[in-house]
Structure formats: C-alpha cells, structure tokens
Amino acid sequence: MFTIACLITFLWLCFGYSLSFSPCLENGGTKEVFGDAGRLWLRGMMKNTVHALAPTIPEALFCAYQLTFAIITAALICGSFADRMKYHSMIIFIMFWHLLVYCPLAHSNWHFHGWLYQLGCLDFAGGNVVHICSGASTADNH
C-alpha cells in the first residue's frame, strides 16, 4: 500500500491535479471530462493562490486534501487484487487507472466545468468519486 501511496502522490502532483482541477480554458474541447494542462507539475501554483472551489484556503492545501481522496480510492481497489495480480502488473494498472478513470471522474463530479457537476450531481464526502469509482473498478476485477 505504501507503494501505491507514493505512486499516486507522484502522479497526482505531476498530472492528476491538473487533469482534475486545473482552471479550464474556454477553448478546451474536453473541459467537461478533463482539465487542461494549466497545472501540470503544479505550474502556476504559488503559496497565495486559491482555487475557485475552495477560495478560503491556499491552493496547495486544496491539492493535498484532494490527494488524500486519490490515494484512498486507489488503496480500496488494491484490496481486491490480493493473489489475483502480480505486483508489477498492479502498479501498471493503478497508474493507468488513476489517469484514465479517477481523474476524469473527479473532474466531471467536482469541477465547475464537469459534465456531472453541470447536471446538478451532488457528491457529499466523495461518495460518487471514491466509492462508486473504486467499487465499480473492484467489481470489474473479479
């Protein structure tokens, strides 16, 4: 599990936060599903910047808070891999799963431009992103 925590932390800080929560440009074609590259490698994030979803705290704190959701969701899935998948296969799967499943779902649910958010989807305490995403991915693994 520590490997998963380290892997997700690296992916989140490099790519995941930008794909999930970067301020979308109006000319972006996929702003309903993915964020843009505005925060790749946390570019443009200063100690006094804030995110529109959490305007009362620094954006770095918001990024760290959302990182905990990303780690927990990946850890929930790894519980279903016991004796079913080799270790290196699990690492590769989680890497692609995080970037292609978790990040688009987090953006769609929690970002102002996300298509589920625009439909009025309410996600209290991460139920849609964390539990539905990890549960469906776990069920698919069996």
How does the language model describe each region?
Residues 1-142:
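Hydrophobic alpha-helical transmembrane bundles of multi-pass membrane proteins
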